Amino acid sequence: MKQKILLALIAFISLVVLSSHNLFIKLKSFHLNPETEATIYLYNGTFDKSEAILARNRMKDVSLINPGEKRIHPNNSSWFEENNQTVLKFKTGKEGTGVLGVSTTSRVNNFTAESFIDNMKHEGLLQVLEDREKSEEATKPVRKKYSKHVKAIFQVGNTVSEDYKTVLGYPIELVPLNNPYDLKIGDELSMQLLIHGKPMAGEMVYASYNNQHGHAKDGSPLDAFKVLTDSGGIVKVKITTAGHWYFRTVNLIKSTENDADYISLSAAITFEITK
């Protein structure tokens, strides 16, 4: 009996931890050669380390747009697992700026009141906790339905193209408004947040690079930049260093569905600055 209780507790803790993971598409280098094999890695954990694989049956959409080509969907069987990373090999095309995207199915996690507080702190959603205090819901357990939607912008050769701004139609999506591979240190990158295809104002977007990220002792996120979207759903961030960059955000709303109390949509986009 004690062993069953312990196993159930471990499974519960694992679900809570996994729902707190950020998801990123990483490449060893986002600068690729034309007509060659390239490899992407799904990091399910932090920007530096993948702590769990992403099961292939959770991949609702996998999209690849090579420069100047139509959107294709690599088969789930093309993926394999390696060191807690989910890995995909693909072939690049001609020179230009390409896009990779992964969208997951939804999953419901059950939280105790205490574990939900930790989860919200981890995601930087403190307003949700304040609202729960005001509505006297702070001591109630929570069912959160979550999904993750991530992209990577990669550069093939030296010639840039307009493919970087392709909208994949995910429930939540970060879309660059200027090409990251046109930028140098000191330039500004504009990013638009779309939720169900519409610009979302007043949403917090985090951005950072390399190893400049983490969490404080209270669990709150520590990213290099923290910016609210304007009325057009846009944030602007000054590029301060070369390296691998990300923008990320989480949208959480009260659910009208019977199987969840909240709906969580998270988005991230990755790219590289070399100039």
Language model segments and positions:
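Beta-strand-rich domain onsets/edges
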Residues: 21-38, 119, 123-189, 194-203, ...
